[in-house]
């Protein structure tokens, strides 16, 4: 059976996410390490961003990279382990743009990503999910080359126990990651490809123009992903329905089974034996309905689809 969970808030402290995951009987969960709309770029991460480390295996977590104390990180690790949960995954800040044509933003993004990787390692998280970014008015090819350079610099300066996970995107504007070919190129051209993986976001994939709404659609899209990138690179799912129609290039999430994708895609994914030991995290709207947490409602639906 896949590991079900959701993105959870760390407002009030890291432990709050673990407490919410336990309350909702999740197997796994995703968090931000700090506010996703604010930069966290420690000086030492900025210094590391400007050069490559010679031996990746020698890189260890350093407190100066972290947006929290080592004591809080240790308490967090102990809490999710004692709860019997799978290791969490971190989502990087929305401000990071590894494809940026602007040198200052690119360097700042690399430094911020290095800090995210150190933070994830301190928390016992196995990976950091990041959107590849946008070259804006520059060409796709140049944007991809910049992402490859950024990824290699980040991984050379990051603890080796954390993977960098490229997320599929909806294709809004000039953002990279909406085509499987783009992600494959980044992975193939990286000198650290063994530490790169992919997050398959259902809402993004659907909005980008990859069909998912029927079981046949789902299998066809997964087969194309396998031929282009390889299912061995697929490390985590974001299970989200889409408020926007197929091929819209718009990123707006909806509760599972209530959007344009529909329930069959999720039935297909949760019952595919190839994904029986993969994390599946929801990023659906938060809130309550009739006094019931919306994450609980969506989790109930997922569990009801299991055969």
What is each PLM-predicted segment?
Residues 289-307:
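C-terminal helical cap(s) of enzyme catalytic domains, especially alpha/beta-barrels
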Residues 1-92, 96, 100-118:
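N-terminal pre-domain/capping segments
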Residues 81-82, 97-197, 294:
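Active-site acidic/histidine proton-transfer and metal-coordination neighborhood
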